[in-house]
Design a protein with these regions (language model features):
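Extended charged
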Residues: 1-28, 47, 81-172
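Short cysteine-rich loop/turn motifs with clustered Cys
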Residues: 23-51, 76-78
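Histidine-centered nuclease catalytic patch
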Residues: 42-74, 83-95
């Protein structure tokens, strides 16, 4: 299957490379990766509305589990909405995504993977079960992989900024 639903465990919501780097660094990385990939979706080849998608591997053990960042993949909005299909479904149920858009996304999955609706439904159910199992794990550590140094630089810059602004507020 070229296009898969990849649901992020609940304890890891908002713990993303994008958040760790900050918007400016994330945008710079995303644009560099898009240029490297010919400004095309790494899954379906579309050139429309490209996103940076974090690809993670999860290692669950008793105690502390680990989320390992494998890569940042450039993908289109359709593939991105499929990767996070539980979120997409919530937006659909809230009326934020139209029935036409929701149906088009399901069709996109079937077209990219050359499968039937039943296979999509089964894949989604398996993804939800995996998500539920992983979400029960409360303690997680993050391995930023090849992005570790970039995360450390961003963290140091934020700390330096916070310290300089704290000193300013004390002197005014």
């Amino acid at each position: 299957m070229k296009l898969r639903i990849q649901l992020v465990p609940k304890p890891l919501f908002e713990r993303t490379l994008r958040e760790a780097l900050g918007k400016a660094r994330w945008d710079k990385l995303r644009h560099r990766l898009a240029e490297t990939n010919g400004a095309r979706c790494g899954i379906c080849g579309s050139t429309q509305r490209l996103h940076g998608h974090e690809v993670w591997a999860y290692q669950q053990k008793k105690g502390v589990a680990t989320a390992v960042l494998l890569k940042v993949q450039i993908i289109c909005i359709d593939c991105h909405d499929i990767r996070h299909f539980a979120r997409t479904t919530k937006l659909f149920q809230a009326g934020i995504i139209t029935p036409d858009r929701y149906g088009a996304l399901r069709k996109h999955f079937r077209r990219v993977n050359g499968c039937r609706q039943r296979e999509f439904d089964e894949h989604f159910i398996r993804a939800l079960r995996t998500w539920a199992r992983r979400s029960k794990q409360k303690k997680w550590k993050i391995d930023w992989g090849e992005f570790r140094d970039q995360v450390e630089v961003a963290k140091a810059a934020r700390t330096k900024w916070a310290q300089s602004h704290a000193r300013r507020s004390l002197t005014t």
